[in-house]
């Protein structure tokens, strides 16, 4: 089982020799030189590492950092060394959480949100430690006898404060995380063959065996016979069967400490088609020899496969539709009874072949070959094998839906179903707990009062999964002898459940070649599939937010009117551009029902940011009172520079503030020049300062302070609306008076609205008579 430990001094990166030394120190010291050499010859060490990643504060699954490792077979010891560094000594001491899981990415819930109904959500195995603790010590996680295959680590910082940070305005701190994996595996492993006794002798070091479990194994009996000790009577041996998995571990341990020379371990439904690790350890004192004989006995049954051949024989004149492809009850009982008399043994299950159809990335559909229905009997379970073993199926959500007609399940009958990994559950006649040798399955039931059951499995483990169903009559078993229930199965793998609903967005995430999915929620909705509405906005709140963010842009009508009145036609055009695209960008940016997008979201966002920067640019240049030609050139060049900087980094604050600061320098230089040239302060009127410049500067300062330090995800809709009002209001106050030679609405007077008689000065070339 995993355990957290510390050792060594702080390191930015550990060398391979140091890592190997740490791994070797984790093992007990040798009892004898000869035995140590013999043990060292059968063990090899390997080291794996991945590129470091920058951690983020947790808001949804996409803000975590995923690491994917593959543990080789026959590994007896695994150690993760967790390295953390910071980008600056001034970084705060944050808590770092690391989750571990075998077979699939960990299912985590740092925010404590609710999952959808019938969703499996086991607590993940994780460790938490402060940054200072991780940097002072080499924090490690050790796992004995880990399961071979895919292992996943997920690391993140504490939940975010929901504050909207402006990139580049406030210095950020980088927290870098890198795990190293060290394994020690056995290269000399004896194979325990079925029904063949294998003598073993233990001294100080364990003995490692492996057993191959064939398909359709009902039971495995592991026996220790003739166990003797050189000093004391009894059998001081501990047997560990299976591998360690996280977050749930189903390793089986047998301790033979009695006086009897034999003991055994019985495993029901062991994992099919794979090697099973067995470790024998001596519990006697050092230098005490323990000898015994190990033996594995299998109980194997035969499956009855429902194939197309059987279906054709039972229904020769019918087509393959849902109603026609049904296995006759009498034919099943007749064939099973005739075949069970063969010497090869009785049937233990009814096997339904399954068609796997890959439809998209992390999208698979399963369907029985004979249609969507499965016939469920009381004599034996009906089993479907669901292959989720490609290594790319563990990044989505696996949904299982079972349905039956209300008339087929009576009050005294019950359809019991179990979903298990590695091997199916076959013991419905004795228990309904869905427990196999190394896995706790997930039960599902169909009753007269509930004719539908569903199960949602986020991030299913990479394995062969089995769905087994059987008809059970707890009160009167004789009622089930001739009964057959037809169950409809809907089995599919999708990236996100219901595509994260109306208040979420399903996003595909990638770590090297591994693809997984997560839900990004909006409008206050939270949870794994954006179904937790504990902090959600109501429809009225959503509409109010949309109206505030869009209608607040009408404040730009004031600077537009003032610009036209003072003959600033270019400035009025820029303000209108900003008002138009800011309005429709925020109409498209809303979650839920209040959404209106006239262009793509990315285009609207770019135009909104460009309008904000250009509005500030033209306002400051207008205040500088430059000559017309120079002013027009700077207006065009500045807008082009802002457009280029937004293309490079749209959310970088200095990409917008840089050109605006340059414009402010130009304005300040012109004002200082006029002050020196005229011998008095510019602008000269105190009314201009008191009633226009100071209010405009105050509104701009408050708006910038609010934009950079006060916005959060919760108050965004009204703080950003105030930002719109302050930005437009400051532009209206800061615009300078019109030129002395220009009259009011002079630009509009250039567009006459009446007829004019024009004199034709061209010469007549010819005359028409």
Curated annotation (Swiss-Prot):
EC number(s): the record gives 3.1.1.4
Q: Which domain of life is it from?
A: Eukaryota
List, in alphabetical order, the GO biological process terms annotated in this UniProt record: lipid metabolic process
The compartments listed are: Cell membrane; Lysosome membrane
Task: State which residue ranges cross the membrane.
Answer: 544-564, 568-588, 604-624, 628-648, 652-672, 689-709, 716-736
Q: Which reaction does it catalyse?
A: a 1,2-diacyl-sn-glycero-3-phosphocholine + H2O = a 1-acyl-sn-glycero-3-phosphocholine + a fatty acid + H(+)
* Cellular component, GO annotation: lysosomal membrane; plasma membrane
Null mutant phenotype: Embryonic lethal with anterior-posterior axis formation defects in embryos from 6.7 dpc on until cessation of development at latest in 10 dpc.
Cytoplasmic side residue ranges read 565-567, 625-627, 673-688, 737-769
Chain ranges of the EGF-like domain: 495-531
Task: Please verify whether the record's keywords include Amino-acid biosynthesis.
Answer: no
What cystine pairs are annotated?
A: 496-506, 500-519, 521-530
Q: Where is the signal peptide?
A: 1-33
Q: What does UniProt say on post-translational modification here?
A: Glycosylated.
Q: Which Pfam families match?
A: DUF3522 (PF12036)
Q: Which residues are glycosylated?
A: 138, 411
Which keywords fit this entry according to its UniProt record?
Answer: Cell membrane, Disulfide bond, EGF-like domain, Glycoprotein, Hydrolase, Lipid metabolism, Lysosome, Membrane, Signal, Transmembrane, Transmembrane helix
Kindly list the GO molecular function terms attached to this UniProt entry.
phospholipase A2 activity
Topological relation to the membrane, as annotated: Multi-pass membrane protein
Q: Which residues lie on this side of the membrane: Extracellular?
A: 34-543, 589-603, 649-651, 710-715
- Has UniProt tagged this entry with the keyword Hydrolase? yes
Q: What does this protein do?
A: Involved in the lipid remodeling steps of GPI-anchor maturation. Lipid remodeling steps consist in the generation of 2 saturated fatty chains at the sn-2 position of GPI-anchor proteins (GPI-AP). Has phospholipase A2 activity that removes an acyl-chain at the sn-2 position of GPI-anchors during the remodeling of GPI. Required for the shedding of the GPI-AP CRIPTO, but not CFC1, at the cell surface. Shedding of CRIPTO modulates Nodal signaling by allowing soluble CRIPTO to act as a Nodal coreceptor on other cells.
Similarity-based family: Belongs to the TMEM8 family.
Protein name as annotated? Post-GPI attachment to proteins factor 6
Give the organism the record lists: Mus musculus (Mouse)
